[in-house]
């Protein structure tokens, strides 16, 4: 993508933006601009409104009709000359023409021009710009806080926020600004909140006024999404109904909230209720684009073929019954047997592919076949190691599919409080996994976190955000913009730091890229599967029945996620036998050097940033420091783990002393994390603390300070160790 006025060097970026911002504001005084939509649509009106807001902030008088203005911006669609979702910005004299390949591209063009103006470009300095999407599907997975997949106060605390339409307006604004194009709303049972199914009024728990409130919420979310050019989907888990339906008919006794792991109820009542609910939902919500189906929880006791047939006969048939265009997300099965336990199988892959291909072209556009990339912990290695249940064969890819495309879900179950941003990880991910002709795009999102209520911020000073997603603006901007165009340069993201915080923040993107790589390296080193098996920013993992700090013993024994990484156990065992590792393998000493190099450089980059005048900037810098110290903690812990395992395999007492020394240093870095985070972060409810239980755990507060005792135990583990104790 050509970025026009943002094509500046990193060195000169801050000064460039400050100078241009000042000049642009002065020049704009007393000038008027007409922002015109010759072919008015809700999307053109939205793009014009957002652009007009920026122009007004820059000091222009904005008009919506030609009244002899000094400047004009014309918004138009030309499907003949641009790809869908593409746009061009063409300046000529006092007229700037924004052309979209469709209405969505038109919005992107308007927002791109607004971004130029916000970053200081003067009207007459706008240069020709064009862009088109790299990937067709760029979605956010959003788990709703009602009828949630799991019971937890970490999720239910968002209930009121997620019913606030002002919140949704801001969230959807963020999505389109970052060029996401689909919002997918996930919960166990969406239909109870959306319709009163005609033949099953007893299934609804609501009064008329209560149901009207729920329906207004959904209608407005879908309307606002459509206005912003966003596709909308509801996604759910197979056989779940309302408690009221289950109790009225004596069916589905464990297939309603808070149950989420039960046997499949294939009774005629449940089949009819769900098929009719799907149909009625699509009929009553014309702005809803599609539905996503799952073959997982709520289907225990059914074989893979029975699950697939049930989905076809009930859910997919309900969509087709609606007699209107519908888009389909078809998730790959999670289990290969009759239980709900995870499992991958080529036979199930063949069964699923054949079923999807039988659907032909009955759904609008390609069917999006959703696959979890590296299970629940996609912010690890960009190498595809596993999906939900195990390794994935090439069944879905070879031969090239004709009516569907694969969409990867990169889940985040690892960092909710600390801000994250590693642009080169995303670029590499797309380069490795997003360029194949069978790939349609990506989801990003979480199962154990909802980006709604800000339950993190402890300081009372004013900050620049109201809701949780606004704290993580860099995460969303990086993923959204790079999925649209992986060639988007870092200067685009650096410019946002400077615009928000001034020239002193110019180093923050680089600092985040270095410091928050700690998450990627931890999750590449420490193998994980489902949601609770790792919580990166807290160095927690599911161990037995509970979620706890990753002890030195657990770190030694744990296999790696990335096959290029070498575990402590394998490293020490190989060296003790006189072996070695090929070039390209990431051994513990190499990983230690990487962690320390990047953490120390990140700390250097933020060391001189003055945060005294901005609580928001203080948080940005503090999160860099927290990630960096987590990296330094992990580095010392790895050194201690190698020394301890060497001692246990027959090393000398010096190895034991070395292990104790390094683990004491690791504790000091943890104390530094506490020093950074205790004053500014609340104790935070964490879904992972449910552990292996399917019930909510009320004792679920996390803070780095709360687990210091677990961290300190590493030193005692080393002191108590004996040779031969493995």
Over which residues does each language-model region extend?
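Catalytic-core regions of glycoside hydrolase
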Residues: 62, 181, 197, 201-211, ...
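N-terminal secretory signal peptides that target proteins for export/translocation
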Residues: 1-11
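Extracytoplasmic/secreted proteins, especially bacterial periplasmic and envelope-associated proteins
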Residues: 43-46, 50, 105-108, 112, ...
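Feature activates predominantly on carbohydrate-active enzymes
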Residues: 40, 47-50, 54, 82-86, ...
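Terminal, low-structured helical/coil segments at or just beyond the last alpha-helical repeat
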Residues: 702-726
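Conserved, mostly hydrophobic/aromatic
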Residues: 102, 140, 175, 293, ...
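Acidic, contiguous N-terminal accessory segments
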Residues: 12, 16-20, 28-93, 123-126
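C-terminal non-catalytic alpha-helical accessory regions
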Residues: 446-696, 700, 718
């Amino acid at each position: 993508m050509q970025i026009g006025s943002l094509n500046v060097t990193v060195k000169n970026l801050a000064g460039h933006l400050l100078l241009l911002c000042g000049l642009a504001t002065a020049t704009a005084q007393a000038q008027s601009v007409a922002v015109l939509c010759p072919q008015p649509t809700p999307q053109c009106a939205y793009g014009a409104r957002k652009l007009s807001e920026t122009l007004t902030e820059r000091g222009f008088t904005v008009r919506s009709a030609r009244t002899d203005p000094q400047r004009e911006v014309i918004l138009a669609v030309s499907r003949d000359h641009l790809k869908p979702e593409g746009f061009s910005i063409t300046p000529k004299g006092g007229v700037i023409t924004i052309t979209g390949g469709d209405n969505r591209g038109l919005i992107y063009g308007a927002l791109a021009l607004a971004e130029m103006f916000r970053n200081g470009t003067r009207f007459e300095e706008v240069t020709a710009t064009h862009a088109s999407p790299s990937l067709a599907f760029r979605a956010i997975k959003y788990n709703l806080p009602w009828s949630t997949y799991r019971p937890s106060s970490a999720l239910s605390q968002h209930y009121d926020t997620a019913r606030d339409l002002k919140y949704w307006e801001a969230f959807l604004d963020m999505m389109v600004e970052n060029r996401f194009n689909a919002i997918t709303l996930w919960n166990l049972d969406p239909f109870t909140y959306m319709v009163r199914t005609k033949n099953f009024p007893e299934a609804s728990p609501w009064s008329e006024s209560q149901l009207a409130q729920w329906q207004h919420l959904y209608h407005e979310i879908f309307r606002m999404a459509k206005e912003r050019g966003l596709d909308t989907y509801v996604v759910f888990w197979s056989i779940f109904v309302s408690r009221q339906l289950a109790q009225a008919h004596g069916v589905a006794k464990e297939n309603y909230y808070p149950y989420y792991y039960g046997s499949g109820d294939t009774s005629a009542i449940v089949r009819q209720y769900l098929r009719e609910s799907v149909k009625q939902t699509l009929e009553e919500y014309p702005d809803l684009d599609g539905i996503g189906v799952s073959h997982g929880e709520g289907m225990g006791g059914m074989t893979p073929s029975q699950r697939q047939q049930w989905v076809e006969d009930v859910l997919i048939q309900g969509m087709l019954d609606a007699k209107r265009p519908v888009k389909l997300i078809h998730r790959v099965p999670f289990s290969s047997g009759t239980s709900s336990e995870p499992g991958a199988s080529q036979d199930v892959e063949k069964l699923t592919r054949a079923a999807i291909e039988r659907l032909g072209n009955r759904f609008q556009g390609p069917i999006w076949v959703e696959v979890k990339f590296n299970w629940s912990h996609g912010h690890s290695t960009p190498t595809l190691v596993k999906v939900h249940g195990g390794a994935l064969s090439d069944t879905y890819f070879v031969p090239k599919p004709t009516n569907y495309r694969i969409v990867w879900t990169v889940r985040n179950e690892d960092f909710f409080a600390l801000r994250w941003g590693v642009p080169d990880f995303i670029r590499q991910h797309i380069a490795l996994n997003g360029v194949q002709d069978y790939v349609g795009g990506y989801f990003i999102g979480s199962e154990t976190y909802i980006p709604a209520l800000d339950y993190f911020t402890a300081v009372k000073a004013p900050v620049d955000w109201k809701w949780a997603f606004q704290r993580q603006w860099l995460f969303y901007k990086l993923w959204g913009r790079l999925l649209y165009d992986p060639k988007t340069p870092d200067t685009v993201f650096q410019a946002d730091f400077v615009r928000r915080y001034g020239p002193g923040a110019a180093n923050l993107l680089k600092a985040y890229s270095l410091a928050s790589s700690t998450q990627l390296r931890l999750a590449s080193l420490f193998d994980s599967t489902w949601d609770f098996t790792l919580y990166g920013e807290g160095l927690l993992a599911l161990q037995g029945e509970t979620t706890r700090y990753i002890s030195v013993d657990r770190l030694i024994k744990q296999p790696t996620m990335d096959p290029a990484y070498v575990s402590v156990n394998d490293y020490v065992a190989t060296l003790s036998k006189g072996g070695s590792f090929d070039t390209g393998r990431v051994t513990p000493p190499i990983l230690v050097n990487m962690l320390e190099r990047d953490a120390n450089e990140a700390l250097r980059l933020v060391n001189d940033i003055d945060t005294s005048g901005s609580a928001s900037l203080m948080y940005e810098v503090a999160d860099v420091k927290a990630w960096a110290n987590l990296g330094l903690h992990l580095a010392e812990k790895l050194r201690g783990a190698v020394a301890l395992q060497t001692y246990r395999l027959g090393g000398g007492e010096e190895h034991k002393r070395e292990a104790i020394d390094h683990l004491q240093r690791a504790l000091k870095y943890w104390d530094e994390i506490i020093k950074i985070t205790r004053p500014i972060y609340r104790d935070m409810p964490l879904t992972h603390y449910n552990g292996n239980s399917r019930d909510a755990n009320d004792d679920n507060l996390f803070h780095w300070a709360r687990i210091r005792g677990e961290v300190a135990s590493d030193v005692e583990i080393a002191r108590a160790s004996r040779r031969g104790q493995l």
